Amino acid sequence: MGRAFEYRRASKEARWGKMSKLFPKLGKSITMAAKEGGPDPDMNPKLRTAIATAKAQNMPKDNIDAAIKRASGKDAADIKIIHYDGKAPHGALLIIECASDNSTRTVANIKSILNKGNGEFLPNGSLTFMFSRKSVFEVEYPKRDLEAVELDLIDYGLTEMEENEFENDKGEIEKTLTIYGDYESFGTLNEGIEKLGLTIKSGNLQFVANNFVEFADEDLKEIEELIEKLEDDDDVQAVYTNIK
């Protein structure tokens, strides 16, 4: 899955680099995690990880604290996580994750963006068997032996581990480790990562394609334009694809 990671990293950073809505989206992730598991990060692994992800993107502490406080408000009570299935041009598959207080508005916006971008809105559940729901963590590259890390984390629910190497925004070569586990293992895997002293750069539950597809550069450009428009929508939290 190395190339898939490189695509995800490059495309995400390109979009986030010019996306003024980054902090609100990170804040909404924090609010939803606090709403689900409580406002105490020590007792809520999803919240701890959402905070770590926000900090890695330099989100100010005041914004993080405000996002946690919003979890107890009426607005947060109305927000629901919704997933929509779709196709991008050239057959790329999309699962679009939204956090919305008005599903009627959200589905109308998603359909409009897909139609204008030569995509297709699919019935809910169409892609269920083409993606797997997984716990996914990206951590700083460990100093200790990777085999030892892998063996230790297997006891906490690790199913796969992936080394990544890429050029960061400073032009330096950076290495990270992506750690995968089953959907149900998020809390225990998070605990294992913390016990090993690994620094979490990001972590959440994701839809990971069972099979990735490689697209030509000219096709990828059109697909990327559609994904960018989807991610610019206020209600969209993430777009998962089968792009290799």
From Swiss-Prot:
<keyword id="KW-0238">DNA-binding</keyword>
<dbReference type="GO" id="GO:0003677">
    <property type="term" value="F:DNA binding"/>
</dbReference>
<keyword id="KW-0963">Cytoplasm</keyword>
<dbReference type="GO" id="GO:0005829">
    <property type="term" value="C:cytosol"/>
</dbReference>
<dbReference type="InterPro" id="IPR002876">
    <property type="entry name" value="Transcrip_reg_TACO1-like"/>
</dbReference>
<keyword id="KW-0805">Transcription regulation</keyword>
<dbReference type="InterPro" id="IPR029072">
    <property type="entry name" value="YebC-like"/>
</dbReference>
<protein>
    <recommendedName>
        <fullName>Probable transcriptional regulatory protein CHAB381_1426</fullName>
    </recommendedName>
</protein>
<dbReference type="Pfam" id="PF20772">
    <property type="entry name" value="TACO1_YebC_N"/>
</dbReference>
<dbReference type="InterPro" id="IPR049083">
    <property type="entry name" value="TACO1_YebC_N"/>
</dbReference>
<keyword id="KW-0804">Transcription</keyword>
<dbReference type="GO" id="GO:0006355">
    <property type="term" value="P:regulation of DNA-templated transcription"/>
</dbReference>
<dbReference type="InterPro" id="IPR048300">
    <property type="entry name" value="TACO1_YebC-like_2nd/3rd_dom"/>
</dbReference>
<dbReference type="InterPro" id="IPR026564">
    <property type="entry name" value="Transcrip_reg_TACO1-like_dom3"/>
</dbReference>
<dbReference type="Pfam" id="PF01709">
    <property type="entry name" value="Transcrip_reg"/>
</dbReference>
<comment type="similarity">
    <text>Belongs to the TACO1 family.</text>
</comment>
<dbReference type="InterPro" id="IPR017856">
    <property type="entry name" value="Integrase-like_N"/>
</dbReference>
